[in-house]
Structure formats: structure tokens, C-alpha cells
Amino acid sequence: MKKQQRLVMRTVILLLLLAALGYTIYANFFTEKTAVAVGSTAPDFVLSDLEGREHRLTDYRGKGVFLNFWGTWCKPCEREMPYMNELYPIYQKQGVEILAVNVGEPKLNVEKFAERFGLTFPIVIDRQDQVLNAYGVGPLPTTFLIDKNGKVKKIITGTMTKEDIKQHLESIKP
């Protein structure tokens, strides 16, 4: 009886290891991962904002786009949002848009966060992580600076100071 229990346990462990190995191989070789590189055209997407309006990246052609991927739980994201909000009206008048892409959180959480900080720039939610994956985003926050022609000028991972954000917004003015 004891030998039979050991055999069953070994079989279960072996099956779990094989499943983990199979998943690892599948995830690394067969799933589509498109990392965006500096100089490439930013992948187009359509996402809805908190009011239900659709935002298509190509609709922003002719303007610089500060494309920021973030989460409400992300402390570095929380630190840079007020700076982005303060600079948004200044640079919007100069042809630069800030578009904040939340990474798949419930709309209510995002709305509460936006209200708490009084955010005025467009916030869209990537419910299925399709845009996140298309851009190859890893840690948050990650920001893509996109020029007026839709080309990625720079990719920034990690939190930014107000001065950093200002310099980046300056760099993508049309």
C-alpha cells in the first residue's frame, strides 16, 4: 500500500513538471510577442476611455504622444500622475497629447484613482492586455514617446520626475 502511494505521488509530480515544461516552451516559442523598438512605427490600437469614447492611436497623427502604461496599484505610477496632469494642459496646446493606458483593471478602480488625483488627460483601459503585449511592456510604469509621424522616439521604464516628464514632452512637440 505504501509503495502504491509513493508511485501515485511520483506520477503526479512528474505530470506537474511536464505540464510546467510544456507551458514554458509554449510561452517562449509559440505565443506572439511583439516588442516595440525605438525608431519603429507605434502599433495602432483602439481603446475606450472612462466615458466610453474610443481612442485610436492613429487619430493622434500630427501630434506628439506621451503613451503611458500604468496601474492603480503601482506606487511609481501614482507619484508621476500628478506631474503628468499638471503639464498636460500646457503641452496639449503645443500639440502633445498624454494618453494613459491602464493595464486591465476594473473601470471603477480606475475612475476612483482618476477622481482622487483630478486627472484630466485621457485614460483608456486595456482590458485584455492586447496593447500591453503588442508594445512588449514589462514593469510599470512604462512610457513610449511617439512623434508626430507615429514613430517611437524613446521608451522609458520606471518613474519620472516632473522635470523628466517636461523634457520628454518637449522632445515630442511637433
From Swiss-Prot:
Compartments in which it is found: Cell membrane
Keyword Disulfide bond assigned: yes
Domain Thioredoxin: 36-174
Main location: membrane
GO cellular component, one term: plasma membrane
Cysteines paired by S-S bonds: C74-C77
Origin superkingdom: Bacteria
Gene3D superfamilies, per database record: Glutaredoxin
Mode of membrane association: Single-pass type II membrane protein
Recorded metabolic or biological pathway in which this protein acts: Protein modification; cytochrome c assembly
Function, in words: Thiol-disulfide oxidoreductase which is required in disulfide reduction during c-type cytochrome synthesis. May accept reducing equivalents from CcdA, leading to breakage of disulfide bonds in apocytochrome c; following this reduction heme can be covalently attached.
Similarity comment: Belongs to the thioredoxin family. ResA subfamily.
Protein name: Thiol-disulfide oxidoreductase ResA
Organism: Geobacillus thermodenitrificans (strain NG80-2)
